[in-house]
Amino acid sequence: MNVLSCSINTLKGLYDISGVEVGQHFYWQIGGFQVHGQVLITSWVVIAILLGSATIAVRNPQTIPTGGQNFFEYVLEFIRDVSKTQIGEEYGPWVPFIGTMFLFIFVSNWSGALLPWKIIQLPHGELAAPTNDINTTVALALLTSVAYFYAGLTKKGLGYFGKYIQPTPILLPINILEDFTKPLSLSFRLFGNILADELVVVVLVSLVPLVVPIPVMLLGLFTSGIQALIFATLAAAYIGESMEGHH
Amino acid sequence: MKNVTDSFVSLGHWPSAGSFGFNTDILATNPINLSVVLGVLIFFGKGVDLLDNRKQRILNTIRNSEELRGGAIEQLEKARSRLRKVETEAEQFRVNGYSEIEREKLTLINSTYKTLEQLENYKNETIQFEQQRAINQVRQRVFQQALRGALGTLNSCLNNELHLRTISANIGMLGTIKEITD
């Protein structure tokens, strides 16, 4: 009897160790919708980090930038550079959009990789990077779709739809399909990468809690930065593509 | 055996869900690895001096601009002083030119005056000369008229007796003249 309970305990323990929570959500009921509360909480934290640091950085601007101001100017320059390379000469109005995308995704990803979210315990599910949830990435990808449609329509009016039959009308179905695959690929790429990163780290931590996960975590930092850059670059590229004149 | 498994279980123990709270399990919440990762990040982030480079670049740009500005101001100053010099020279030239013109005018007026005077003199001389000639002519004419009248008178009323009387009177007159002259 004793031996049995002992072995049951052992099994339970082993199960607990390898029990990684996926698909567990902390649901909030808002107006008939079930929302993922943990994602909202981490998003708010990310937004607060971004707004707070930006406010602190630009509070006392100097001619010769130092510290935070220098850093934020560098980030802005980087974003402008990305937008300029992808969109072209008329990149100016799109810098805020691209910058928002890049900064939000980047800080989200890195918050998942750097902040000890798991210290805070939720009734259900657990806190992680907001981009760890498909809803966030789909929202971002749909915003990108709306943005590139808006960019094309304001630039060329209804003539924008001429690009669907651009090389030949035979490609019409593929061109229409592209409008669906773009947000799909954007959202799935980001979601998959971040979820995979975090899962690998969680699994490794549950198996070997110390030292071993560190290289993977560093790799996760690298890939999440790259993913943010890819998302921003692709969004800018789509906007640029819909704005460029056809010859 | 039980102790070992218990410790093993507690090692992987997940606090049961249900309410908000803090997970105090150091191994599960993973702060050690996170701090190591953060430390590595900060260490290598410090090594990359993008921001320092940027600051240095901005400083250099500002310094260059200052230098260029200084140079430009200097050049402007130089150009201004040259302009001033040229202006004064132009002023001098203008003044000189005016005085030259004034002098020229005066000399011209003077020479014209002289010419005019000379012409006046010529005119006066000519007038005098003409006058003189006219007077002479008149005189001559009057003289001829008188002579002709006298000759007529003489021819009409000269007879021998008168002739002789005249001659004798003249001889007498000449004689007295001779006496006087002697």
Swiss-Prot record, chain A:
Q: Specify the signal sequence span.
A: none
Q: Which PROSITE patterns match?
A: ATPASE_A (PS00449)
Q: Which GO terms describe its molecular function?
A: proton-transporting ATP synthase activity, rotational mechanism
Note the InterPro entries from the entry.
ATP_syn_F0_a_bact/chloroplast, ATP_synth_F0_asu, ATP_synth_F0_asu_AS, F0_ATP_A_sf
Q: What topology does it adopt in the membrane?
A: Multi-pass membrane protein
Q: Which Gene3D superfamilies match?
A: ATP synthase, F0 complex, subunit A
> One GO CC term of this entry?
chloroplast thylakoid membrane
- Spell out where the chain crosses the membrane: 38-58, 95-115, 134-154, 199-219, 220-240
Where in or outside the cell it occurs: the entry states: Plastid, Chloroplast thylakoid membrane
Which key words tag this protein in UniProt? ATP synthesis, CF(0), Chloroplast, Hydrogen ion transport, Ion transport, Membrane, Plastid, Thylakoid, Transmembrane, Transmembrane helix, Transport
Record PANTHER family: ATP SYNTHASE SUBUNIT A, CHLOROPLASTIC (PTHR42823:SF3)
Its function, per the record, reads: Key component of the proton channel; it plays a direct role in the translocation of protons across the membrane.
Q: What is this protein called?
A: ATP synthase subunit a, chloroplastic
Q: Which organism is it from?
A: Nicotiana tabacum
